[in-house]
Amino acid sequence: MCKVKMKVCEGQYLRSSVTLESRQLLDLQVGKSVLALFKASAATVSKDKTEDVSRCFLFGQVSRLPQKDKGGEVTLRLPNGLNVVGFIRGNHGLEVGSEAYIQIPEQSVVIALLG
């Protein structure tokens, strides 16, 4: 297995674990542009960043969320304008415009080639 670190925006990265064979088949090299995918149901949105080394954290601003007393899908806009979606539990205390973190387990991040 090898770890792949992908820059999402300034100071924010996603990590993934791939087999050596996958690394070779994808011809992964430093500086190569790739597409990183994860299911929204694998990502958790929260107001605070927890210290969990097995997860990647991205920081952004809430642009869409469910009612405060209900959980559901939340969209965060990252500083570079990208939108990412994750889930949050009910009674979350966030509002549109709030700053929040999305936590993604590195084993949930899949790498694909562009084009």
Q: What spans do the regions from the language model cover?
A:
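A short macromolecule-binding patch
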Residues: 12-18, 37, 82-89
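A broad, low-specificity signal marking well-ordered, structured residues that form hydrophobic/aromatic
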Residues: 4, 14, 43, 74, ...
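N-terminal intrinsically disordered, low-complexity, charge/repeat-rich segments that act as generic
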Residues: 1-17
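Glycine/charge-rich catalytic "coupling/switch" loops of P-loop NTPases
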Residues: 20-65, 70, 90-115
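Flexible glycine-/small-residue-rich
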Residues: 6-10, 38-40, 78, 104
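Short aromatic-glycine-enriched beta-strand elements
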Residues: 1-5, 67-75
